[in-house]
Amino acid sequence: ELPDGEFPTVSYPNPEAAEAFELGLKLGKKVDADLILATDPDADRLGVYVKDAKTGEYHSLTGNMSGCLIGDYVISQRKEKEGLPKDGAFIKSIVSTNMADAIAKYYGIQLVEVLTGFKFIGQKILEFETKGNGTYLFGMEESYGCLTGTYARDKDAVVASMTLCEAAAYYKTKNMTLWYAMIAMYERYGYYKDDVQAITLKGIEGLEKIQKIMNTLRENTPSEIGGY
């Protein structure tokens, strides 16, 4: 059966939206799945629901949570199997969780912050390769995107899905679900709460309002926001 490019089962095929998981959750509960994955149409962002084995409930992971789960797993496995390079780097966007900082500190690698947009992570990878000033280990942004290798310069939900499934299998051998692996990370690195508020401005009026806001920011750029 060929996929339908119109995505008729959802009004908005976005892995950040709960409605995109309605059919997946229904099937997941039926077959008792450990995790449920969904990507966006171009397969660069990954949404995840994981099962709580004690309650049977499925919990949604934010992009920060899934990114940290994958990043911690990738880095820990590399450390165990071949050791970490002295100049190893974990790259994140400036709006991503500070748990990434704690993970980098725990493994003794550098934490590199870049501007919002995965292209800046890609640029940093290129800089590492050309200048020899770092070894890329993992990169993530809070908007459900990450990259586990240097084969690409953009986020990739296909390999992220594979890696998260591998992590789930690894933790299952230790009698842990991904949900409890996440809780274990909170206990090790500290508790971090994040929330994303999306504001949609529709139509021509919405576009005009957006342009007005952006023009105001460019012409009268604030020196601080919220006291920072």
Feature locations, PLM:
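Well-ordered alpha-helical segments embedded in enzymatic catalytic cores
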Residues: E19-L23, I70, F120
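Short Gly/Thr/Asp-enriched flexible loops that form oxyanion-binding sites at enzyme active sites
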Residues: D44-N64, A100
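Catalytic or ion-translocation cores adjacent to nucleophile or general acid/base/metal-coordination motifs
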Residues: T62-V74
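Phosphate-binding and adjacent anionic-ligand microenvironments
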Residues: K29, A33-L35, T39, E57-H59, ...
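Short low-complexity, flexible loop/linker segments enriched in glycine and/or proline
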Residues: P8-P13, D52, L126-T130
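N-terminal small/polar loop signature for handling phosphorylated ligands or for N-terminal nucleophile
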Residues: E1-R45
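A short, conserved beta-to-alpha structural element at the edge of catalytic cores
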Residues: L2, T9, G67, S76-E80
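Short gly/pro/ser/thr-enriched loop/turn and capping motifs at secondary-structure boundaries
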Residues: L2-G5, R45, S66-L69, F118-G122
